[in-house]
Amino acid sequence: MRKLYHFPIDPASRQARIALAEKKLKVKLEQIDPWQTNNEFMSITPEGVPPTLVDLVPGGTITICGARAICEYVNEGSSRHPLLPEERSARAESRRIAAWFDIKFSQEVNAYILHEKIEKSFSNLGPTDTQTLRDGREHLDYHLSYLTWVLEQRDWLAGDTFSLADIAGVAHISCLDFLSEINWKNWSEVKRWYQTAKSRPSVQGLLTDRLPGFRAPRHYTDLDF
């Protein structure tokens, strides 16, 4: 059976899990703490961070590291439930938005909020820096404004169908939602999209994830909040 090394409240790991679930591929989940040295895991992946997928194939195993590589790998492995649109321009747009989340959103939002709230907690890096959190939240508002503009024109982030763009988006947004970082009253278009994405079985499986010392908001598991 396939094995996915992951961390629950990690946008990259969540993307891999959603993609595998969309393709209805069975996988064994192995939780990895990214901030602890794990020699066994380091022997599997040079990056030393999740997600990493180990796939059993005839003649041995294949190891795929990183959310983008895993998502593309599982999408190309089967034609059922495609994760990219049919049109070439739409495929390019889906990949663009996925990269926007993984690079720009990650650097300007997650590097502030997830670092302060989760990484510091697990790494014993000291108290939360409130100014860093304020900066991250200001950046988050900018990104949510951009998402609102996109979703006023489309049903999904890259067009008419659920794609890798939405997988990346819901993976990032759901981690922030777990930490009660989004005031949904202010973001109705993003909320509509998020509710629809949360209703997919591939995403519902993430909503039971928990971390020691953290409590998800009441609406987190509610599909119609």
Each predicted region: which residue ranges?
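GST-like domain detector, emphasizing the conserved glutathione-binding G-site
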Residues: 1-130, 134, 224
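Short, solvent-exposed turn/loop segments enriched in Gly/Ser/Thr/Pro and often Arg
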Residues: 7, 164, 210-211
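A generic structural-conservation signal
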Residues: 29, 160, 186, 206-207
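Positions that flank functional sites
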Residues: 34-35, 162, 212-213
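Active-site-flanking alpha-helical
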Residues: 75, 172-173, 207
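GST-like fold's C-terminal all-alpha helical module
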Residues: 101-199
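A late-sequence structural motif
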Residues: 200-201, 205
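Acidic/histidine-enriched, glycine/proline-rich intrinsically disordered or flexible terminal extensions
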Residues: 210-225
